[in-house]
Amino acid sequence: MIMELENQLSKLHELKNNLKEMGASLDLASLEKKSAELELKMQEAGFWDDVQKAQEVTQEAKRVKDKIDKFKNLNERIDDVEVLKELMEENDEETAKEIISEVKALSKEIDTLKIETILSGEYDRNNAILTLHTGVGGSDANDWTEMLLRMYTRWCEKKGYSLETIDYLPGDEAGVKSVTLKVKGEFAYGYLKAEKGIHRLVRISPFNANGKRQTSFASVEVLPELTSDQDIEINPVDLRIDTYRAGGAGGQHVNKTESAVRITHIPTGIVVQCQNERSQFSNRDTAMGMLKSKLIELKERAHKEKIEDLTGELKDMGWGSQIRSYVFHPYSMVKDHRTNVETSNVNGVMGGDIDNFIIAYLNS
């Protein structure tokens, strides 16, 4: 207990210095000024005339205030632990346990704040559009795509993010051929951009009667959902819009009306589709949002003027192109080939514990 307490008190000093450095990079005075300006803006006459814009300003005001409050709260808690240490009597195990627990909690929260300070790209705070596609591997690959879908769903639950299914195409025999989700929450894109690439699975195939080892691939594509002030104009002449009957898990509304929408951007050949809503108008609106995100990504790839984290094409979905390997047999190991971070806790990873991989990539 004494040795662990000493280690945590040493860690506390390190955390205090880290927080001080972050305070300088955050520029707290500027944040407080921005918070005051946003508060005044929200009090202006006619503020709610443009509801969407007003909601975005309100959300921005909350984000800024939350960041200020979080930083101040962490500083106060460090001070409280230091006071507790001074007041602690000899052999006071209860207070020692309290200090150890609080320093561990502070360490985790300061690490999160550090990452969110790094996530300063234009789109990092945005919601994310996450698309999974089956690669090489047949039914095994479809099953692998569904496993990844569960992994990201559980990760989102841990983060407090909400999910909305935009498009879903089941596999012929098992699993999922492709699925597109909207991940809603602050920094959803900033975190998930670290997952963009090819994911490889090695295991004994449940679809092979001889129990042979099978390698499967799936791709992960991540785009930011644009806000109104990041919007772009698209010439209607450049679009081909097709409607079709929605498929899916069944129900009285499935396959009865042509509510699903597919939009093709003729100059680039980009195709997006949405079948989530019962309304054709809603599906068209969602699909247009996805198209704009893809066009923004295309522009950033071509010019590399604003941000670097949208660059890079997905390679062919096969050997040698993966960003991460998930090996279930002949041993258990998940390894990220970009950072060399690895773990033998395969079940934990598939249960959504992927922050170690994401944070290592963002710090690299």
From Swiss-Prot:
It holds the Pfam family PCRF. One of its GO terms (cellular component) is cytoplasm. Keywords: Cytoplasm, Methylation, Protein biosynthesis. Coiled coil: none annotated. PROSITE patterns: RF_PROK_I. Methylated by PrmC. Methylation increases the termination efficiency of RF2. This is Peptide chain release factor 2. It comes from Clostridium perfringens (strain SM101 / Type A). The gene is prfB.
